[in-house]
């Protein structure tokens, strides 16, 4: 392998249609984000908001999945991550559709005059406690800078009446998040519990909330089969993105 190829592999993740560099981002490209970006409902979406975009992964995945006239706003508090997201977008097929904003979502959201029919976030979920290696990683992983109640309130202010707000969380935290959302007037419309294999309990949950009441569709996704290869359902969900599927 050439040195340049090795650096690319260390510093980012190559998908079928785009490359995500993440060496200057606290949170790297991982299965959680890939699941959320591939799973979120995009039918009839006209405008998308990505809260805490990090490397820009979710914004890029949603750009691939939606029509060319759908604008995407991606908001990131950390300046280094936002700059890398801007670079990833600039080198992607969709630089004209994705706008990265270096800002605090709590300051940015009240200034908006349009609403979004898809809001997506891979939010922090740890309560402040054990220190992280860097302040940037602590910001990305802990709810001190954006607690879940505030996130739900911001999404409620920015969403259209029939829009969806989608998140991925650890199973137990997702259950608490769901209860908090219901208490605030949200309706759970989609839920997918994610397990590593058939023998294990779910460890992640994908959730889609809406201001509008309606039937809730729930299912379960297993990432790997008994042979340790990706399952048919996981492959079907993500094969538009993974390079070797």
UniProtKB/Swiss-Prot annotation:
Signal peptide bounds? none
Kindly state which reaction or reactions the protein catalyses: adenosine(37) in tRNA1(Val) + S-adenosyl-L-methionine = N(6)-methyladenosine(37) in tRNA1(Val) + S-adenosyl-L-homocysteine + H(+)
Q: What class of enzyme is it?
A: transferase
E.C. designation(s): 2.1.1.223
Is tRNA processing among the key words of this record?
yes
Q: Name one GO biological process term.
A: tRNA processing
Q: Name one Pfam family in it.
A: MTS
InterPro entries per UniProt: DNA_methylase_N6_adenine_CS, SAM-dependent_MTases_sf, Small_mtfrase_dom, tRNA_Adenine-N(6)_MTase, tRNA_adenine-N6_MeTrfase
Role of this protein? Specifically methylates the adenine in position 37 of tRNA(1)(Val) (anticodon cmo5UAC).
The name this protein carries in UniProt is: tRNA1(Val) (adenine(37)-N6)-methyltransferase
Q: What is the lineage of its organism?
A: Bacteria, Pseudomonadati, Pseudomonadota, Gammaproteobacteria, Enterobacterales
């Amino acid at each position: 392998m050439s040195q340049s190829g090795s650096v690319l592999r260390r510093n980012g993740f190559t998908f079928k249609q785009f490359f995500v560099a993440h060496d200057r981002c606290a949170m790297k490209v991982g299965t959680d984000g890939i699941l959320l970006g591939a799973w979120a409902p995009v039918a009839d979406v006209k405008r998308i908001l990505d809260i805490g975009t990090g490397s820009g992964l979710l914004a890029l995945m949603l750009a691939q999945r939606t029509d060319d006239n759908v604008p995407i706003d991606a908001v990131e508090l950390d300046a280094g991550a936002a700059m890398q997201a801007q670079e990833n977008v600039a080198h992607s097929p969709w630089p004209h559709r994705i706008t990265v904003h270096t800002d605090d979502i709590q300051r940015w959201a009240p200034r908006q005059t349009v609403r979004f029919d898809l809001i997506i976030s891979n939010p922090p979920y740890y309560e402040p406690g054990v220190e992280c290696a860097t302040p940037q990683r602590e910001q990305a992983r802990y709810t001190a800078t954006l607690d879940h109640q505030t996130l739900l309130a911001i999404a409620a202010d920015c969403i259209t009446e029939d829009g969806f707000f989608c998140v991925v969380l650890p199973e137990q935290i997702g259950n608490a998040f769901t209860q908090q959302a219901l208490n605030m007037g949200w309706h759970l419309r989609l839920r997918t519990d994610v397990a590593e294999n058939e023998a294990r309990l779910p460890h992640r949950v994908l959730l889609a909330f809406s201001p509008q009441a309606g039937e809730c569709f729930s299912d379960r996704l297993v990432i790997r089969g008994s042979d340790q290869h990706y399952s048919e359902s996981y492959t079907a969900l993500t094969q538009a993105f993974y390079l070797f599927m």
